């Protein structure tokens, strides 16, 4: 019995040491702010706001009743009218975008100062994935919406970590999902993807949508294992994506795990910034 309790204490001590190491690591890490991606998001919101009508709001008393009044192009619309209700939604949406833009501009001023470069602007970029020699699909928001989240039927018992409605296979995947969620980047986890040359689907770790470019990116997260078999699987994934017309570090980017070391999200942030910035120069 004494040996049993000694064993339990050793396990708890080991877990405590790992937790302390993790906390110390997290305290050391400073957030990496992706400069080009931040500029793209700011210019995207500025463009959206510029395209929206300038709606102002005030109040008036009509027959003893206070009503919200919306003014656009010097014309007045009451909130109980059809147009007034539409303008109310437009006013709320515009206000939300302005608040989001203010936060991003504050981050820019805090870390970079100066003018936001205007050449890093939103636009539609066309990239294609080949599902067969004669079947190509554009990697845009329509493609993204057709993907099913968490579609991989294999080894579901290994998904034991829960975050935001989905079970993940590793702590690093949870951190990646949290990163995308908190940064407002839509993503699908392990969606089913058909690639040219394959008779079976693959399940990418993450497919993300860059709304500002209407463009999808594939993100594979690998464990760094000293295993020849694992390395062969990794090499096969590289080749499968290339055979479907996807370029490494442009259409597909990769991150890696190191045993015993918490995944550093600065790595993901740097990679993401790089593939987005490179995409801006695609003709």
Residue ranges and their predicted role:
Residues 1-142:
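Nuclease-adjacent, charged terminal/linker segments that flank catalytic cores
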Residues 118-186:
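Solvent-exposed, charged helical/coil patches
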Residues 243-283:
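Basic, glycine-rich
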Residues 171-175, 198-201, 236:
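Short, well-structured alpha-helical interface segments that form or flank functional binding sites
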Residues 193-201, 227-228, 258-263:
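Acidic-and-aromatic substrate-binding clefts and catalytic sites of carbohydrate-active enzymes
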Residues 180-181, 238-242:
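Class I S-adenosyl-L-methionine
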Residues 160, 203, 207-237:
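Short beta-strand-loop-alpha-helix junction that forms the active-site gateway
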Residues 166-168, 181, 186-212:
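Active-site metal-binding core of divalent-cation-utilizing nuclease and nuclease-like domains
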């Amino acid at each position: 019995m004494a040996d049993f309790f000694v064993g339990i204490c050793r396990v708890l001590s080991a877990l405590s040491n790992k937790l302390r190491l993790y906390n110390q690591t997290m305290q050391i890490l400073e957030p990496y702010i992706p400069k080009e991606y931040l500029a793209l998001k700011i210019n995207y919101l500025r463009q959206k706001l510029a395209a929206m009508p300038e709606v102002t709001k005030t109040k008036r008393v009509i027959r003893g009743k206070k009503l919200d009044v919306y003014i656009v192009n010097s014309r007045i619309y009451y909130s109980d009218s059809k147009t007034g209700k539409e303008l109310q939604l437009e006013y709320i949406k515009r206000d939300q975008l302005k608040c989001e833009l203010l936060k991003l501009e504050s981050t820019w001023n805090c870390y970079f100062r100066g003018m936001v470069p205007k050449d890093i602007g939103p636009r539609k970029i066309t990239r294609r994935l080949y599902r067969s020699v004669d079947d190509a699909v554009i990697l845009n928001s329509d493609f993204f919406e057709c993907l099913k989240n968490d579609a991989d039927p294999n080894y579901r018992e290994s998904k034991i970590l829960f975050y935001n409605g989905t079970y993940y296979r590793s702590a690093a995947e949870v951190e990646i999902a949290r990163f995308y969620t908190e940064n407002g980047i839509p993503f699908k986890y392990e969606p089913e993807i058909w690639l040219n040359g394959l008779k079976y689907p693959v399940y990418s770790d993450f497919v993300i949508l860059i709304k500002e470019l209407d463009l999808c990116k594939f993100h594979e997260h690998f464990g760094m294992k000293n295993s020849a078999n694992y390395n062969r699987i990794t090499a096969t994934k590289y080749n499968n994506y290339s055979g479907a017309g996807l370029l490494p570090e442009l259409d597909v980017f990769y991150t890696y795990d190191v045993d015993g070391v918490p995944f550093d999200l600065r790595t993901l942030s740097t990679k993401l910034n790089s593939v987005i910035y490179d995409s801006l120069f695609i003709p």
